[in-house]
């Protein structure tokens, strides 16, 4: 079992943790989040980005992690970036607790997300269905108010 965690910080009140667990290279990865301080009653995009670089805030994280050269999509789509995790839903206080299992996110192997950045976006991910070029790259999920580098945990 490999475990990893990212502590979310940024230029906003959004804080939280995102944890990753994978039993072995062929198993799906469970991604869990506990996020506070976001917009109330909203759906917000969450993605793994290419770089573990936050020297210039969350913009330094680069584009979505996309080792197979695909276009942006929903987590359930065959055509998607590895880093495409879709949206999470916040409650009336702007908090979100949840989890998802994903078959493309890996902690083990050549396409590992370790050392990369998880980004929480200010807008809703349109899952690549927005009808424009930006939708096929980012899901039109908007600015990056919080992020954290994914690192090995106990």
UniProtKB/Swiss-Prot annotation:
Keyword Metal-binding: yes
Annotated CDD domains: Cu-Zn_Superoxide_Dismutase
Annotated catalysed reactions: 2 superoxide + 2 H(+) = H2O2 + O2
Disulfide bonds: 58-147
Enzyme Commission numbers on file: 1.15.1.1
Function: Destroys radicals which are normally produced within the cells and which are toxic to biological systems. Plays an important role in the phase transition, and may be important in vivo, as it would facilitate the intracellular survival of the fungus by providing a non-toxic environment in the macrophage phagolysosomes.
Induction trigger: Expression is down-regulated in the mycelia phase, whereas it is increased in the yeast phase. Induced during macrophage infection.
PROSITE patterns tied to this protein: SOD_CU_ZN_1 (PS00087), SOD_CU_ZN_2 (PS00332)
Keywords: Antioxidant, Copper, Cytoplasm, Disulfide bond, Metal-binding, Oxidoreductase, Virulence, Zinc
Gene3D superfamilies the record matches: Superoxide dismutase, copper/zinc binding domain
Upper classification of the organism: Eukaryota, Fungi, Dikarya, Ascomycota, Pezizomycotina
GO cellular component terms listed in the entry, alphabetical order: cytoplasm
The protein's assembly and partners: Homodimer.
Cofactor note: Binds 1 copper ion per subunit.
An MF annotation (GO) of this entry: copper ion binding
Skewed-composition ranges (Basic and acidic residues): 126-137
Pfam families recorded: Sod_Cu (PF00080)
Protein name as catalogued: Superoxide dismutase [Cu-Zn]
Subcellular locations according to the entry: Cytoplasm
Organism: Talaromyces marneffei (strain ATCC 18224 / CBS 334.59 / QM 7333)
Binding site for Zn(2+): 64, 72, 81, 84
Top-rank taxon: Eukaryota
Binding locations of Cu cation: 47, 49, 64, 121
Cofactor(s) it depends on: Cu cation; Zn(2+)
């Amino acid at each position: 079992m490999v475990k990893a965690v990212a502590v979310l910080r940024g230029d906003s009140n959004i804080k939280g943790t995102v944890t990753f667990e994978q039993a072995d290279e062929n198993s799906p990865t469970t991604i869990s989040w506990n996020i506070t301080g976001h917009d109330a009653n909203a759906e917000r995009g969450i993605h793994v980005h290419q770089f573990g670089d936050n020297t210039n805030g969350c913009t330094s994280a680069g584009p979505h992690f996309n080792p197979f050269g695909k276009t942006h999509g929903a987590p359930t789509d065959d055509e998607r970036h590895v880093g495409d995790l879709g949206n999470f839903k916040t409650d009336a206080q702007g908090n979100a607790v949840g989890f998802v299992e994903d078959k493309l996110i890996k902690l083990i192997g050549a396409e590992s997300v370790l050392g990369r950045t998880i980004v929480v976006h200010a807008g809703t991910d349109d899952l690549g269905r927005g009808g424009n070029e930006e939708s096929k790259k980012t899901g039109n999920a908007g600015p990056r108010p919080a992020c954290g580098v994914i690192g090995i945990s106990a």
